[in-house]
Amino acid sequence: MTLTEETLRFIREHRKDNVRNLALQAHKYPTVDVPAAIIQIVGRQIAEEKIPAWAAREGILYPTHLSMEQCSSEVTANYKVKIVSDTGYGSRKTFTDLTGGFGIDCAFLSACFQQSAYVERQETLCTIAAHNFSLLNLKQVMVCHEDSIRYLQMMEPVDWIFIDPARRDGHGGKTIAISECEPDVSALENLLLEKASHVLVKLSPMLDLTLALHDLKHVQAAHVVSVNNECKELLLVLERGKELVPEEIPIHCINLTASQKVQKLLFIRQQEKEHTCPYTPTLKTYLYEPNASILKAGAFRSVSSIYNVEKLHPNSHLYTSDEYIPDFPGRKFRITDSSSLNKKELKKLIGTEKKANLTVRNFPASVAELRKRLKLAEGGDIYLFATTLADEKKLLIACKQP
């Protein structure tokens, strides 16, 4: 990818501008490759939020919008580094990223190794990666323009392989199984572990975690990773020569927050089955909502047991306690009032409020429907939870942050 000095100057001068307006004004800049410039401007604008360290580096090249949307963030890439850096996982000399993409994960992970290989079948992405790795002085990374499966078959053994299969349903259908992704890691598992003692698999949070743990035979740990309470990635560590039944696999529920605090919960499915979880139709002083990673992983009884909180209903996934628990891995609220769906009670609950933050958990109406009925805009200091209690009573719970 070659950009003229004039196009590069245009990118620098307009990097914070609205790209739609720039596209409409393209005729004003006959000596500038405006379409190419817009790709770079959009890429950098996304990177400012997603990969700030790269956005701050002058000269980084960016791929198309789709590749930028699909790539890992700086925060999740750093978390992968922590996984691979675990001293219990043995040697870290050689590494191969079989699905290179924009190269974020490869760039961050390669810092842990003496030699690394970036493999990507799209030539444009290889060109971008080679430029950026050189700019970032990542001399230990070799860029390979090749199909991942073909490269895997012919490569020399390494210590670690990273692979990020893409969901391949082109019709908007819901992809939930590893076998529906490309490449199919379940079909390649034996070959992957012939070539590496450890494999780190990144999966979409849309996939079924339980199904993935059954489909792969050598999973040693699963990491469900959220950023600011939005589930972003499922990460599976495969280890050669070791097998665990799915019920014994450690599952790390991680929420990386804007305040740099990390919410963690570790559980295994066997313990989850054995834990008791008390249900209550009575609201206590505080309301607790587990973070997105815990909800995705299904650690509902474990949360109750570890933090000594009672659940409102088997399907509501909200908990209550008279004790304030500052390190609870999720959102924490002080309950101020509650109401049935009776008009008088609702009027008393809402009062003169014009807006509130509304959440629905196990309730026969959507957020949009309730917002319209209650005539409330989004925002403000009030948090409303529409849910069902253990006695099947439908309730609106008003809360504030403690």
Segments predicted by a language model, with ranges:
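SAM-dependent transferase fold signal centered on methyltransferase-like domains
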Residues: 1-402
